[in-house]
């Protein structure tokens, strides 16, 4: 069984743990840097990206997270987690983890009161996934090797690049665990490649 960490500094941690377990993997809430060595994949949960960055800096997680990304182990960022994974953020001089060749606009769908749900078609997942968007970012631009898995209107809301997956929406806030299960499969495949 693969072990998937959920960065436990801030955000929808419990909901991700429940979704990982429902997808047949072991979930570990990561609150200490050394726990990164014990896991096969990592989820960066949605929350408030500025607060999350402050906590990542406070607990010296940034370099270990960048090292984890360089190791080739899969990472999945939802909402604020997508912002953390992006190489370019509109209106900001530097990236956070910067593992994905994507450009992201923060709070692009509006403020908290503009939050909404939308039916999405997600490549490799299904036609009828309900995406929960809360002050959501979206992907403005992608490198050639980034696969766009889903759009809402003309906006890219789910993307994949190598071992990295990012979504504007919160798949953990529904009882539909297919997006998490998709990530669990990515982690299983990556672990098998390391064994071979």
From Swiss-Prot:
NCBIfam families reported for this sequence: PLP_synth_Pdx2 (TIGR03800)
Tell me if Phosphoprotein is a UniProt keyword of this record: no
The entry marks the following residues as binding L-glutamine, namely 47-49, 106, 134-135
Catalytic reactions of this protein: aldehydo-D-ribose 5-phosphate + D-glyceraldehyde 3-phosphate + L-glutamine = pyridoxal 5'-phosphate + L-glutamate + phosphate + 3 H2O + H(+); L-glutamine + H2O = L-glutamate + NH4(+)
List, from the UniProt record, the residues annotated as the active site of this protein. 79, 170, 172
Which key words tag this protein in UniProt?
A: Glutamine amidotransferase, Hydrolase, Lyase, Pyridoxal phosphate
Molecular function via GO = glutaminase activity; pyridoxal 5'-phosphate synthase (glutamine hydrolysing) activity
One GO cellular component term of this record is: glutaminase complex
Q: In which pathway does it act?
A: Cofactor biosynthesis; pyridoxal 5'-phosphate biosynthesis
Gene source species = Bacillus anthracis
Family in the record: Belongs to the glutaminase PdxT/SNO family.
Give the PANTHER family listed for this entry. PYRIDOXAL 5'-PHOSPHATE SYNTHASE SUBUNIT SNO, PYRIDOXAL 5'-PHOSPHATE SYNTHASE SUBUNIT SNO1-RELATED
What Gene3D superfamilies does this protein's entry cite? 3.40.50.880
Q: Name one Pfam family in it.
A: SNO
Subunit structure, interactors included? In the presence of PdxS, forms a dodecamer of heterodimers. Only shows activity in the heterodimer.
Q: Which gene encodes it?
A: pdxT
Q: Could you tell me what this protein does?
A: Catalyzes the hydrolysis of glutamine to glutamate and ammonia as part of the biosynthesis of pyridoxal 5'-phosphate. The resulting ammonia molecule is channeled to the active site of PdxS.
- Name a biological process GO annotation: pyridoxal phosphate biosynthetic process
Q: Which domain of life is it from?
A: Bacteria
In Swiss-Prot or TrEMBL terms, this protein is called Pyridoxal 5'-phosphate synthase subunit PdxT
């Amino acid at each position: 069984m693969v072990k998937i960490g959920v960065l436990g500094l801030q955000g929808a941690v419990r909901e991700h743990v429940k979704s990982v377990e429902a997808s047949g993997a072991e979930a570990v809430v990561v609150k200490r840097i050394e726990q990164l060595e014990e896991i096969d994949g990592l989820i960066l949960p949605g929350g408030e990206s500025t607060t999350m960055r402050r906590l990542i800096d406070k607990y010296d997680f940034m370099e270990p997270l960048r090292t984890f990304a360089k190791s080739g182990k899969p990472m999945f960022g939802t909402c604020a987690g997508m912002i953390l994974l992006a190489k370019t953020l509109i209106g900001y001089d530097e990236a956070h983890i910067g593992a994905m060749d994507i450009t992201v606009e923060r709070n692009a769908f509006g403020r908290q009161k503009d939050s909404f749900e939308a039916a999405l078609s997600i490549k490799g997942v299904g036609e009828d996934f309900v995406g929960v968007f809360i002050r959501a970012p979206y992907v403005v631009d992608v490198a050639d090797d980034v696969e766009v898995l889903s759009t809402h209107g003309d906006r890219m809301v789910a993307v994949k690049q190598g071992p990295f997956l990012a979504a504007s929406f919160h798949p953990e806030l529904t009882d539909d665990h297919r997006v998490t299960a998709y990530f669990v499969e990515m982690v299983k495949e990556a672990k098998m490649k390391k064994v071979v």
